[in-house]
Amino acid sequence: MEHFNKTPIIIPLILCCVIGISACNNHKTANNASDSSSAGKKARELVSKMSLEQKVAQLHGAAPAMEMTDEAVAKLFEEAKKDPSLLLMPRRVDSIDSLKIPAMRFVNGPSGVGTGDNHPQDAATALPSPIALAATWDVDAAQQFGKIQGSETILLNYMVMQAPSMNIARVPQGGRVFEAFGEDPFLTSKIAVYNIMGIQGEGAMAVAKHFAANNQETNRLSVDEIIDERTLREIYLPAFEAAVKQGKVAAVMSAYNKINGVFSSENNYLLNDILKGEWGFKGFVYSDFGATHSTVASALGGLDLEMPNGLYYGDSLLTAVKSGKVKESVIDEMLIRRYAAMYEFGFFDKNKKIAGKIPAKENGALSREIAEKSIVLLKNENGLLPLQKGNIKTFAVIGDQIDKAAAGGGGSSHVVPLYTVTPIQGLKNKFGASVAFSTSDGKNVAEAVAMAKKADIAIVMLNLFTTEGMDNEIVFSKAQNDLVEKVAAANPKTVVVIKTGSSVLLPWIDKVPALIEAWYPGEEDGNVVASILVGEVNPSGKLPLSFPKQLKDLPANTKEQFPGVSNVARYSEGIFVGYRHFDKNKIAPLFPFGHGLSYTTFEYKNPKVSKKGTENGTAYEEALTVELDVTNTGNVAGAEVVQLYLALPSTTALPQAPVKLAGFKRVELKPGETKRVSIPVEARSLSYWDIKTKSWKRVAGEINILVGSSSRNIHANLKFS
């Protein structure tokens, strides 16, 4: 008999969003589950054998039915900061043994196998947070990340890995920014695409979430987001489109919020017209937990499964079918979509390998490698880093989390790690007994300052914990900021390591010589950060979102924009999100999108652009190719992320961002080594959404192609007409 938490279930959400490219030999897909496919035929045959009551019983989750409110959700997640088990509940669709239909079990997963149907929660590999994965700018790392997610999903007896989230970081204050891939739709699409490949290549279903524009936690159950069509198409939908067209993603999760007055789970335009119609999605759509608000409107609007309960798709749906408000053929199609995916992934096969032991050591090592690639060196005056082991005899390590790994953010993505390596443990692993360590939690500032004065090196670690269920101020506490300033004044060799889930204000930036953004590195936290500090790993991470100097510099800087007035949030900034806004308004960010330093230097030479494909190629067809030589001009090996931006012709009638990301390539180079780097530019990147024709249209005129190491650090400029 299953036991589960009896605390009133104010159901959290199950985040999910995923994208993919069809490139793994064993990469499973769901978009071929049509009537003509084997899986589709089997699904249709199965549904033909079911009674109406059996059909309806399969259209909702097994949790008790209940309503949710914004206030109750906020309270739940506040309490869950201390006790994540409060988020546990049934996360499955029950089996029908007489028809040999297995239970479909779901698990949260942006940072690894998180909260699921098992109680107590299973331990799993605590991967670096997805925002850290985005900071790698490495599609191979994204695929490996997905392989760990997918394999552990199967090993822990689940079918559906609810990951990754692909909502754009419109506001850095968003409580779930750490679960997704930053502020740019192109970077988000590419990282998510390969993440899906990894998940589905291991036999688990991936989920594209949260469809669409789930960009804030404040009033998330009811907020109405007013978004113009061009902005929706160019900023908030591209990653989902790629999930369907390239990734053949198994499922899509509908979001909590309304878009232009209509809840996502009953939004016929989003779910039927765009997702299933225009994009040809053949998988199934299910609601985020508690995101269903109607029976008939949702059934006709494209929602195939209500989770986690049957508040609207239980008895109410049965009544609606019997009364003729919803045709039985409509619910047949709902089931066929989900069963076809289950057949495609082999979940009706009794011989499919399910359940087993997680290889903790091997997966932990892979998690560490990904996290090491994600670390961003933001500042490094006078080459303070890497630390030279032979020159250091005393260390002062200061911070209230130095004895605890930053394994992840809060909410339904919470992972119970198989093990953790603390920051202080990681440093001791590198330096051993040859260095004397003094530690302080920083609460006694005078003690911390005295300690720092005596040390050869002072390291201050600041954590800013963010969680689903509430938005956050992107500031450290006054006590934390004061601590940094006083320690830095006491020791000119002070290194600050910040661990955040988003960008953050840094009022003391001019007073510290070295700064590292480590995000939430996962279970290997201590080893990851230490390996960067001592130079065993050369930092190569790049920011997936801009760091502002002050809050008023952000794109959504009015109450009408965020969090909204009277539950309405107006996206009046349009397409000018993140660095697009900073560039358009000539605002200098503290650190620009794409920024990240290295312990070596790189030189860009001999750029060349050539035309490929046709004038009006399909969205992902290569239209241009840019090539250039990149040389490591330093004396240590390193990796550079070469970034390609486009400046499209802009007019008053059709404003364009000053630059937008259209390609990138991570390249590893030995000292003195040169490699010819080739970056494709897709046809979609040369296009805009034409609101008159309701279609993508190629821009006319001269295009500037800029290649550099960040959106503000350009090393090569080409023109193309």
Give the location of each predicted region.
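Bacterial N-terminal signal peptides that target proteins for export
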Residues: E2-I11
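Bacterial N-terminal signal peptides
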Residues: P12-G20
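Glycoside hydrolase catalytic-domain context in secreted enzymes
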Residues: G20-W689, S695-K697, E702-S711, K719
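Conserved glycine-rich phosphate/nucleotide-binding loop
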Residues: I714
